[in-house]
Structure formats: C-alpha cells, structure tokens
C-alpha cells in the first residue's frame, strides 16, 4: 500500500514531523498484518512556489525511507512545479535529484521524452543493474524513430511539391 505521511492535523510542518508520521503509520500497518515489502512511502512533495524548501524536504524524506526504513518511495513529480512556467525542466531536474536520493517510483507522464531520458540516464549514472544497456537501447530506439519520422516527412514533402506543380 502507499503510505501517505499525513495525520489528522493535515500536512506535516517539517521533515521531522513527516518522519514521525511515517513511523506511526508504518508501525500501525505492520500491527494490522501488512508486510514490510508491501509498503511504499509517498514523498509527499509540495509545490516549490508555495514552499521554497519543498524539494529539499522531499529529498530528505526519500533518503530517510531508503537509508533508515529500507522502504521504496514514490512521488508525484508535477506537484513540485505547479504554477511555474516551463514545468518540464523543473520536473526533470527534480526527478534526477530524487532518483539520486533513492526515489523508487514516480507518478509522471511517460510521453515526456526529456523526463524519461533523464530517468534512464540517472539510473545509468548511479550504476543500477543493466541500466547502461537500457539507456543505450532507449537512445537507439529513439534515433530509429526519429529517422523513420524524418523519412516520412521528406517523402510527404516531395509528394506535396509534385502535386503543386500540376503533376501526379
């Protein structure tokens, strides 16, 4: 299950309170029969526009879960950039830094090429198993797709030019 570090009082005020909430909910989950392996902690990232320390607090939470609790983590990437222009750059930078801190999963748009490429590159730079091959395969596939697209566009342009000259 996804452990959301929230209490009846609402959002935690700081990282220490967030850790206390994580511990309380974690202990309760175990007492109810949940297995450690079934628990994933949400980093609970806020928008940087409302809280300038939002990213840092999320990184600290992720590191705590990884290093102290040995728990996987997840977070919604786009929360960090809410209300900002050119959000994909903020989201991508946030993702790469969160991966470095131990982020296991992200709620993200997989069609955002920059974001996905950064995730593959981050895994490779952290020497995660088989990440080098995964990165190379991804880049090769993207290069092939780009070449196919460019071929289709060129052929379409050639056909359009001959049609406008009155030839078939």
Question: Residue ranges of each PLM-predicted region?
Answer:
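ATP-dependent carboxylate/acyl-activation modules
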Residues: 1-38, 46-74, 78-168
